[in-house]
Curated annotation (Swiss-Prot):
Its main location: cytoplasm. It comes from the Bacteria. Keywords: Acyltransferase, Amino-acid biosynthesis, Cytoplasm, Diaminopimelate biosynthesis, Lysine biosynthesis, Repeat, Transferase. Substrate binds at residues 104, 141. It is an enzyme of class 2 (transferase). GO terms for cellular component: cytoplasm. It comes from Shigella boydii serotype 4 (strain Sb227). This is 2,3,4,5-tetrahydropyridine-2,6-dicarboxylate N-succinyltransferase. It is found in: Cytoplasm. Pathway: Amino-acid biosynthesis; L-lysine biosynthesis via DAP pathway; LL-2,6-diaminopimelate from (S)-tetrahydrodipicolinate (succinylase route): step 1/3.
Length: 274
């Protein structure tokens, strides 16, 4: 694995010179191997180690290099044709392979090669980009988007129209992460490497980036870049220092534990916010 990483790191330093016509065999094979390992879930761009999320930057570099070494090609699918550098994940799947891997894909959901989809996942008409990792038991609802290299945990619900930001465009240092047992409400956006910690509930229409103030109304604390575990979050506003205007923020209205979540439905958690 170290040799593979060294090849990727070296090639990335001269990425501006690499084109589909001049990419050398060693680099091409290394990039293709990494994409295959990401596709199978054997590797992932980010993982939790000793309680902390660690981003493997060299894997992200391999994803970026794949756009340098591959030319556009005609892609068949959904009774249409496409023209892109990245093949579709399910292009060569037959019924036996779908049965073996154990997830559902509703047309016209699109998943790029290099994204991992775990067992018991349901993909409604949605989009999952290269390098993403979607863990077991997750629902990606209609028109939801899982961005490049984003990490989605177990038993997550991404509601209709949710956007989970990627790292490729614009280039971000770390992927956006939604931990296990989270609910992301319809049309919400979580981007720029924000981490939504385990068991959190994000209401409909909440937008969170690195500069978004995440205000805990019980403690008065303001968080940036992460939603603490077990938070129930709605959209809100905070006043300016001079009191002349207010600016958007996300508000943590309560904290819940797994026991409470097990007894109370998601809708009930969001309705009783006073």
């Amino acid at each position: 694995m170290q040799q593979l990483q060294n090849i990727i790191e070296t090639a990335f330093e001269r990425r501006a010179e690499i084109t589909p016509t001049n990419a050398d065999t060693v680099t091409r094979e290394a990039v293709n191997q990494v994409i295959a390992l990401l596709d199978s879930g054997a590797l992932r761009v980010a993982e939790k180690i000793d309680g902390q999320w660690v981003t493997h930057q060299w894997l992200k570099k391999a994803v970026l290099l794949s756009f340098r070494i591959n030319d556009n090609q005609v892609i068949e699918g959904a009774e249409s044709r496409y023209f892109d550098k990245v093949p579709m994940k399910f292009a060569d799947y037959d019924e036996a392979r779908f049965q073996k891997e154990g997830f559902r894909v509703v047309p016209p959901a699109a998943v790029r090669q290099g994204a991992f989809i775990a067992r018991n996942t349901v993909l409604m008409p949605s989009y999952v980009n290269i390098g993403a990792y979607v863990d077991e038991g997750t629902m990606v609802d209609t028109w939801a988007t899982v961005g490049s290299c984003a990490q989605i945990g177990k038993n997550v619900h991404l509601s209709g129209g949710v956007g989970i930001g990627g790292v490729l465009e614009p280039l971000q240092a770390n992927p956006t992460i939604i931990e296990d047992n989270c609910f992301i409400g319809a049309r919400s956006e979580v981007v720029e490497g924000v981490i939504v910690e385990e068991g959190s509930v994000i209401s409909m229409g909440v937008y969170i980036g690195q500069s978004t103030r995440i205000y805990d109304r019980e403690t008065g604390e303001i968080h940036y870049g992460h939603v603490p575990a077990g938070s129930v979050v709605v959209s809100g506003n905070l006043p300016s220092k001079d009191g002349k205007y207010s600016l958007y923020c996300a508000v943590i209205v309560k904290k819940v534990d797994a026991k409470t979540r097990g007894k109370v439905g998601i809708n009930e958690l969001l309705r009783t916010i006073d």
